């Protein structure tokens, strides 16, 4: 058969893909058991999409465009995307919600982990460790037992110039280069 016979349209007007999709070959036999959720593209035009977080109460999906310095929001009710839901976003990366429904974001620009309060104000949860600034807070999660916020701080982001502000953080840098 010619390659055109297998061509699929994954563009904005494409129909949702349903599982099991015969064109997707899973290496792990458990993959088909993931369910029959359709794959849909809701937005085009993000420079670097990161940190998707679902808000079950508000019924919306939030994500970050790091170099675009914005957060976007897709709402289930109307299916629309709000550009610049939060702008500027501090070059936010990872996002999550705490058990009170407040948004937690890891910011590359100011190198902070923050929480957006109900009234729109911002609370800084962490911005340094042992007197040294962070590298680039990346992803966060809320611990299921005690509600504490756990986050990663890899040795990139603020140390690179991609986001326009190369920094000397003073934070510990990774020394192991090979996979462990």
Task: Show where each model-derived region lies.
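Sequence-structural signature of mature extracellular/luminal beta-sheet repeat domains
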Residues: 2-180
């Amino acid at each position: 058969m010619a390659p055109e016979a297998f061509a699929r349209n994954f563009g904005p007007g494409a129909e949702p893909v349903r599982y099991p999709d015969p064109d997707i070959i899973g290496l792990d036999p458990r993959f088909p058991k993931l369910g029959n959720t359709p794959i849909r593209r809701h937005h085009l035009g993000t420079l670097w999409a990161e940190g998707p977080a679902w808000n079950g109460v508000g019924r919306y999906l939030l994500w970050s465009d790091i170099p675009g310095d914005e957060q976007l929001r897709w709402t289930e009710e109307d299916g629309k995307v709000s550009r610049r839901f939060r702008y500027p976003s501090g070059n936010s990366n990872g996002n999550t919600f705490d058990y009170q429904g407040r948004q937690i974001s890891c910011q590359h620009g100011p190198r902070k982990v923050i929480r957006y309060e109900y009234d729109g104000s911002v609370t800084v949860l962490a911005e340094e460790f042992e007197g040294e600034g962070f590298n680039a807070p990346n992803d966060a999660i809320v611990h299921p037992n005690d509600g504490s916020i756990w986050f990663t701080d890899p040795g990139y982001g603020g140390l690179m110039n991609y986001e326009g502000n190369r920094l000397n953080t003073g934070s510990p840098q990774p020394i192991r280069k090979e996979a462990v």
